[in-house]
Amino acid sequence: MSGTADPQVADQVLRYISNARWFAGKGRRVQFRSLTPLPWLTEVSDFFRPAAAPGVRFEIAELAYPAEEDPEPIPEARAEREDDSEPTQGSASSDPPEMARQIDPPPTEYYHLAVSYRPAPHAELHQAEIARFTDPDLGPVIAYDAAQDPDACRVILNALLGGRRLRSPDSEARFNAAAESAFSADLEPRLFTGQQSNTSVMLGESAILKLFRRLELGHNLDIEVHAALNAAGISDVAGLYGWIEGSWVSGGRQLDADLAMVIEKLAGARDGWELALDSLRDENASTKITTVSAFAADAEALGRALAEIHHALRSSFSTTKVLGARTAMIMIGRMQEAARIAPVLAQYVPGLRGCFDELSDEMLDTQRVHGDFHLGQTLRTPSGWKIIDFEGEPAKTMAERRAPDSIWRDVAGMLRS
């Protein structure tokens, strides 16, 4: 599958993406722009051999979200603008009337498809079908979601374990295996059906292959942080076993993104949120009068794990200082807004105002933090707490999530949880 030359292929691919659980544009008008294949992971000549593995490669779908009504043509200088943000409503303009109708290009998203090609229908992959068409290399084929095809998953894992670098004139796929990867390509792949934004494949009881679906250009934060914490010897996170990067050309620009990662599957793990709720239920059901929550010891251990991670992040990434006066101004504004919405809080305003005012003459330390820390981002294992999902707050931009912040943001997030 490639390009936009065949409308039937484009329609099939767009239908598959828009119906997927991980598609973020539901309810919006979406436009298929292109589909860019990365190099084959398998030899094309092997595809025609009896009982051969399926043809496998990664492909990048570019989608756009145009306005409800098609705008006037965008001048060339504007069309090259690289800002993908939503246009601001109601902004003033001094342009002449004919220029005032020009708007920025519609926002663009890139979706990652791991594709398994087979020459004939596969009885166990009916739900994974993406499209049927004639491929210039392979002839008539059926394209399936590789995440649901165990044979295709093994092809991907073998490429990762081999540290392969695959190149074509306009694209590249790079496989990076960690020095100590506790998984092998013969583990039984099993699709995890509960995930929304990405796709995870369980690799036996040892590892998880996580395919990123809506791509963020640049290095994925979850990979970046796990790699740094593993290198620092931190045991409070899962082991990173490897990751996959892709490069392709769109609109004359080379784009890069992380496509997938393989991470340790944490045996015997319990969700932190459920553990805390169960602790409270047990305490309330008990006839004994307790002065300390049964979860207190777990909470203390979780705090120590977070502190260890903060210390390692401070050593691994850049740090900076910010004006306390700016932080004080922000917090006072939030406090006043909270008191306006809930007048019962007004009695606390004077005391809190005094606390915030004390920040005005300070310089506050900031560093890389988790950024979206709550009980749902924690797992309790037999060996202790593990903290997961370092991609930051989803509503923020990549630059905002990567920027240094106060460690107390993570503490506040956990207390709120």
Predicted regions and their residues:
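Short Lys/Arg-enriched alpha/beta "domain-start" segment
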Residues: S2-V44
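Conserved ATP-binding subdomain of kinase catalytic cores across diverse folds
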Residues: V56-I60, Y65-D70, P97, Q102-R334, ...
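Intrinsically disordered, low-complexity proline-rich tandem-repeat tracts
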Residues: P71-P73, S85-P87
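Basic polycationic patches enriched in arginine
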Residues: R78-R81, R101
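An alpha-helical support segment within catalytic cores of ATP-dependent transferases
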Residues: A179-L187, M335-R368
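Catalytic-loop of the protein kinase fold
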Residues: R368-G371, L375
